[in-house]
Amino acid sequence: MPKYLNKEKNLFQESLDSFIYVDKSPLIEILNKCIKTKQKYFCLSRPRRFGKSVTAQMLCSYYSRGEDSSSQFDSLKIAKSPSYKKHLNQYNVIFINMSLEFNSARHDVNQMISSVTSSIVKELKEAYPQVVFNSPDKLYEALDDVFSVSKVPFVFIVDEWDRIMREKNEDAQSLKLYLEWLEGIFKDQSYIALAYMTGILPIKKYGNQSALNMFNEFSMTDPDNFAPFIGFTEREVQSLCNEFKMNFNQMQQWYDGYSFTDVPHIYNPNSVVKSISRKRFGSYWTKTETFESLQEYIDMNMEGLRDDIVKLIAGEEVVVNVAKFQNDMVTFKTKNDVLTLLIHLGYLAIKPDSDIRVDNISKFAVHIPNEEIKMEFRNIVEDNEKYSGVYNLISKSYDLLNDIWSLNSDAVAKVFDEAHQDHTSILTYNDENSLSCVISLSLELSTTDTYNVVRELPTGKGYADLVYLPKPDVNKPALLIELKFDKSAQTAINQIKEKNYLQFFKDYKGEVLLVGINYSKDTKTHQCIIEKAQI
């Protein structure tokens, strides 16, 4: 049974036979258009457990001439494509799982390259005994020898190509050796019909150049027309929820949040499948991601990083410049590098429709995408001294919301007084925006299941700072929160009334709590007034 050359189709068959299978075969049509062209090199990066390996197995089964796989694809969407039959089972496919090879070589890159090369050449010799191999220790020459005789081009599928880049990130010699080996296989080789690599990180840069600059890259910051294949689309998730009798709104709350210009809703596929199979919603992230990695990155001493993390946990968006990220896990010069890495790892998601003015090319508005990832952030800050004030405030979230519902304005003010007096001050108060972040943070946990939050909502003659609208079937009052800095809580309440902020609620029937909060810079205390309004 071959390990590399024209592997058997049984791995993809296992996916097809699973109790949940989502048809992502239209991806093949995109690749077919580029076979044997200058655009034949693809590198797609996305987080762990986002379906990279399943896609690789699908491509192997489709392109490989080792077996007739028409029975697997005739009922899939790709079968309707004009290119379907033209490329089905027409190529010699080389499949390499770099993660497995790296482990097998005990993390020795030189040994890994030697082992993979000799193993593939051995399989080539068995498949083509008539071929004379001039330099069997050089993989690219062996491939060319086979192609010159068979005239059958190769499709390369490389899964987890960046494992070496991540594990050997401080071993420059090993990285150079690995990249040069890949470059030799791919660059300007006529035997390549298609090359498809998957990983978590985009291709490593050296200065302004990359050893693999022939590849077209598609990542979590720029997936282009591959966006629907990063995870499950909204339509796919709705269909699964209908089939398996799962609550779609909860599925959306827990696993949605990855957004792109033409595909506004992408869900974490592994977590969707796990939630359906276990019939419950929760975080399945720690089962697949390195928990310590998030701890390490948010703990870094980068100017402004801590404040941005606090804002993100509070449900706000921050701006990230991804242009100078070096596509590794060690080169961190600014907070932008750390936050960009968190995008590629799936901890943060870009928001192309944000109200924040960015170009969505090198600068993006990002946020924590869903409840699953919010839970991971909350778990991380719980035991982190740098964020102890943050966790203390989050832990009081339910009591705070109950105090607001009970019109207990003194208790509400006291919560924020204590938070501000904490020696690990959550944020430096310098304006109403800072105060807004702390309020959002304090209510983030308790309002997840009960409210939809809107920030700086246009209402009447101005903008309300924070509006919390009850979710469907939640019998609780709406909250309209106005914030002041060095003024008074009464001024905040007066502004709500004078500028007719309640006009926003004209289609809402029920009670609204008007919450005015002021922070006095001189006394370092908060004042709060809560009033009822009936719509």
Question: Language model features by range: what are they?
Answer:
Residues 420-453:
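Acidic-basic catalytic patches of nuclease active cores, encompassing PD-(D/E)XK
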Residues 504, 510-535:
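Domain-level recognition of nuclease-like catalytic cores that cleave nucleotide substrates
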Residues 155, 477-481, 513:
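Structural motif
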Residues 1-431:
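Phosphate-binding site recognition
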Residues 172, 176-178, 485-502:
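Mg2+/Mn2+-dependent nuclease catalytic core
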Residues 143-150, 449-474:
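Active-site metal-binding core of divalent-cation-utilizing nuclease and nuclease-like domains
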Residues 184-189, 194, 340-348, 440-445, ...:
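Metal-dependent nuclease catalytic cores in nucleic-acid-processing enzymes
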Residues 439, 464-468, 477-487, 499:
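Conserved catalytic cores of phosphodiester-cleaving nucleases, focusing on short active-site segments
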